[in-house]
Every structure is written in C-alpha cells, then in structure tokens.
A protein has these predicted regions:
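A short alpha-helical cap/connector motif
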Residues: 1-91, 97-232
Length: 232
C-alpha cells in the first residue's frame, strides 16, 4: 500500500459531519495543531491531546481561546475526561503513536498507545467514528527505529475496534476507518469514488507514457542488422 495522503481525511470527515450531524471532534497527537485549527472552524467543540509539552505550548499559541480544548497529557489519562464531557457521538482522529523525531514516544518507550485508546473509546456507550492515522504501521511492522514489539498488528487493531460494537471497517489512504453501520454506505461510496479516480489517473498516465519496450525493440533490431552486415 502506498502512502497516498498524510493527515486526517478532511473530505470524509466533512461528509460524515454533514450527513449525521457530528458536533464534536477529538484528536490524539496535536503536533503543530493544523488539524485542530481546521476542525475548530467546523465543529462546535474540539479536543486535542498532546503529551509533549513543547509541542503542546507551540500549538496552543496559535489559537489560545475559543472552542478548541488544548490538553497536555498522556491520552490514557486525558481521554476518559474528554469522554465524560461529550453529550453525543463524536469523530475521533487517533494520531498519538510515535512518528519519529521530537514527537512523543521514543523517550518514554511508549511508541503506540492505540489499543488503550480504543479500549477507552469502546467502553463508552455511544457509537463513535474512529479514524486511525498510519495504517501502514499496523498492516506491516513499522520501519526502523520503531520497536516492533511496541506496535499491535492489524488483527489486534480490528479486534479492538469490534469490541462492544459492529463497525464498518476499511483501510483507505493510510487511514483505518471504523464507522457505525449507519455510515457504511457513505464511507463505501467515498472510498469507491476515490479509488476510481486514482485508477483512472493511473491509466491516463500509462497511456500518455511512451512504450517502455520500444527502445529495447529498436536496440534489438540494430543489433540484428549489425550481425547481418558482419555475416555478409
């Protein structure tokens, strides 16, 4: 699977919000705050959780007031408090797993809190939308210097998503998508349209590209011509 896009699937999030009236957006892993700022302009309430204080402080300065609840701390301790404040189903964007550099994870030897996050969300009585960044990291062992033992397999992730619920689950554009059954058709159509567009673009590029076998055929013909002349 190639990495088609990085970051939250904003078009899909907006479609889900419009169709089902989601008013709250929760993000784990704030980083520079771009996703939180985007969501803050579209949702009534946004929570974003960041464990690294320097990253948290830098992001918070971009929008210190308003409907974004900037939260410093480990998602394991912060998520239950967020869930207590929700009054309806919400959209979760889970991106707190370590992605290298200065982001949280390596120093604490805590690269991926995903299974704990899913257990907390699934313990809630509501039926939330869950979007997980970096599907490639679970479909196959992540690249070095990540520790393989710190990362759950895709099977473990799917089993956790199915706890106390029966979501529709797909992987699209490096994102694991788990939605309530009421949103199945919307997500399926979204993925099919995106896949169709990508396939047509690929076909168009191939049709516009000169045949790769033509230079080889010409070289072969020249060699044969040279051999014929030598034989004569």
């Amino acid at each position: 699977m190639g990495i088609v896009q990085m970051g939250a699937p904003r078009d899909l999030i907006l479609q889900l919000q419009y169709a089902f009236g989601y008013r709250s957006f929760i993000e784990t892993g704030t980083f520079q705050g771009d996703t939180a700022l985007w969501a803050g302009q579209r949702f009534d309430n946004v929570w974003t959780i960041e464990a690294q204080e320097a990253i948290y402080q830098a992001a918070r300065r971009r929008w210190p007031d308003g409907n974004i609840h900037w939260t410093l701390g480990d998602t394991r301790s912060a998520l239950p408090k967020v869930l207590d404040q929700l009054d309806s189903d919400a959209i979760f964007w889970l991106d707190a797993h370590w992605s290298g550099g200065d982001t949280f994870g390596e120093a604490a030897q805590d690269e991926c809190p995903l299974l704990d996050e899913l257990a907390m969300i699934r313990s809630d009585a509501r039926d939330h939308v869950i979007l997980i960044e970096g599907a490639r990291l679970f479909l196959s062992p992540p690249q070095r210097p990540h520790r393989i033992a710190s990362w759950p397999t895709i099977t473990q992730v799917i089993d956790a998503l199915r706890t106390a619920s029966n979501p529709y689950i797909v992987v699209h554009d490096d994102v694991i998508i788990a939605v309530p059954q009421k949103a199945k058709n919307l997500v399926a159509r979204y993925c099919q349209e995106a896949n169709t567009h990508a396939w047509m673009a690929r076909c168009a590029r191939q049709n516009a590209r000169p045949s790769e076998s033509l230079p080889r055929r010409l070289a072969g013909m020249l060699r044969l011509t040279g051999q014929d002349k030598a034989a004569a």
